[in-house]
Regions:
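N-terminal accessory segment detector
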Residues: 1-90, 97-113, 117, 124, ...
């Protein structure tokens, strides 16, 4: 829990406003995401850990989708694969269950943190053309999507 709560507390104390907090928060989690799989051995280690055969290429969203699904399963967050293809991965999850597993972490920051982390992680794990985003965050059930999406900040 402290790995989530401590950065939130430290960043909130540094920021002068809510907008500044969100900006710094996104930078921290984006950097962490991009650095997660920057080394080739980390990618190969993940493939081995997940049991991904080499017939599945590197430019495949199922690598990131498998990682996310595994993280959710490890944290006992019930989730359902809606799509798991070479073109797109869609994982449905109950918002309250997703945010309720860390009692000390604020809900909005938890969703924003994971979305920012995984969005940038997929850029180095799979390819910069892939993105990860959450749909229906304000509903009872949200969908975590790994797919191709034009990211204007990356162009």
């Amino acid at each position: 829990v402290w790995c989530v709560a401590f950065p939130l507390i430290a960043i909130r104390e540094m920021a002068d406003s809510e907008e500044e907090f969100e900006r710094i928060f996104k930078i921290v989690f984006a950097t962490a995401g991009k650095n997660e799989f920057i080394e080739p051995f980390a990618k190969e280690g993940l493939r081995s850990w997940l049991g991904v055969p080499h017939e599945i290429g590197w430019n495949d969203p199922r690598l990131m989708g498998g990682y996310i699904k595994n993280i959710l399963d490890t944290q006992f967050v019930p989730s359902e694969l809606d799509a798991f293809t070479k073109d797109e991965v869609r994982i449905k999850v109950n918002v309250e269950t997703f945010t309720g597993r860390f009692e000390m972490a604020p809900i909005d920051e938890l969703i924003l943190g994971y979305e920012t982390l995984w969005h940038n992680m997929v850029k180095t794990l799979v390819s910069p053309e892939w993105s990860c985003w959450f749909e229906d965050k304000d509903e009872e059930e949200m969908t975590i999507v790994v797919g191709r999406k034009i990211d204007k900040r990356m162009v």
